Design a protein with these regions (language model features):
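Cell-envelope/extracellular polymer assembly enzymes that use nucleotide-activated donors
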Residues: 6-8, 37, 181
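A conserved acidic beta->alpha catalytic loop
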Residues: 26, 42-52, 68, 92
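Short aromatic/hydrophobic "clamp" motif used to bind/position activated sugar donors
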Residues: 88
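Conserved nucleotide-sugar donor-binding catalytic segment
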Residues: 134-213
């Protein structure tokens, strides 16, 4: 596969010594693969010694350690800056690449428009279900399409290396990534190419999945901070391209503030209710019921496909 670009895989690692072996094994399993480098970033894990033991079984991997936990974006950015590849991807330490990933990647590369700095590869969960709203779609997603969530879902982000090393993730200091803030910043430069190829197996049942326990006070606090930062930076963009999505963000903020024990619950709800009156009824119910009941109701709704599971 000499015609393939060099490929960097960045794996942020925080207390994942029990899952990262499967992740790294999936990367190195194909015998015929592109020239590549793999960077694991230990983000101040409490199981750092066990992590080092696992990584040591893969001599090709470079391990970089943070002295203390700095959050997902900081870990990603440390790995990105250290990467060397023409293409850089971020692979979570509880996910895996598909068995034939070099062939899939080559097909993706051949269709990746030169004007796009980012490419979204498709994913499926461990049950084999696609995690994208439109699994067969292939093409460019511009800023308006992203803000309106036209192609919502869980994807594997891939970047042109020189671009992302110069413009890495926007880090607001949270443990979670608040990825929308970064994607909107990147979309101001170029559209994102969406590939119909599936490259990643997403373990949405993992105990480390960001969607789990999303209304625990600590996670709700971070979710609230993400939404507040997104609204502070991009409310005008949402108002112009997707006013309903702007209203829905205010409603989400009300729910997160309630779960985090924060003030400003009903003021956020009121701002969302004006633009999404029907959804505001459900949001008000969630606020009144509280996080425990809300989490159970949302889980049932997802299982019944009444609300989206990804994106």
């Amino acid at each position: 596969l000499s015609d393939m670009p060099t490929f960097s895989v960045v794996v942020p690692a925080y207390n994942v010594s029990t899952t990262i072996d499967a992740t790294l094994a999936s990367v190195f399993a194909p015998a015929d693969r592109t020239a590549m480098d793999v960077v694991v970033v230990d983000d101040g894990s409490s199981d750092g010694a066990a992590l080092r033991d696992v990584v040591a079984t893969y001599p090709e991997v470079r391990l970089i350690a943070h002295e203390h936990n700095r959050g997902m974006c900081a870990a990603r950015n440390t790995g990105i800056v250290a990467s060397r590849g023409d293409v850089v991807t971020i692979l979570d330490a509880d996910d895996t690449l598909v068995a034939d990933w070099p062939d899939v990647f080559l097909r993706m590369w051949s269709k990746w428009p030169v004007e796009a700095n980012l490419c979204f590869a498709g994913c499926r969960n461990t049950a084999g279900t696609p995690t994208m709203r439109h699994p067969g779609f292939e093409g460019l997603m511009d800023l308006a399409a992203f803000i309106s969530e036209r192609y919502a879902g869980e994807y594997l982000p891939m970047f042109r290396g020189d671009y992302v090393r110069a413009k890495p993730y926007v880090d607001i200091g949270t443990r979670k990534s608040c990825g929308n803030i970064s994607y909107i910043a990147w979309l101001h430069d170029t559209a994102i190419h969406i590939s119909a190829e599936v490259l990643r197996i997403y373990d949405d049942e993992s105990s480390n999945a960001v969607s789990r326990d999303w209304l625990k006070p600590s996670k709700a606090e971070e979710n609230a901070r993400c939404v507040e930062e997104e609204l502070g930076r991009y409310a005008e963009l949402f108002a112009r391209h997707a006013p309903r999505k702007l209203a829905e963000r205010w409603l989400k903020l009300a729910i997160y503030r309630r779960a985090a024990g924060r003030a400003g619950v009903w003021s956020a709800w009121a701002r969302g209710a004006r633009g999404a009156p029907l959804r505001s009824v459900a949001a008000a119910l969630m606020v009144v019921l509280g996080p425990k009941a809300t989490s159970g109701l949302v889980g049932l709704a997802r299982a019944a496909n009444m609300v989206k599971r990804y994106g």
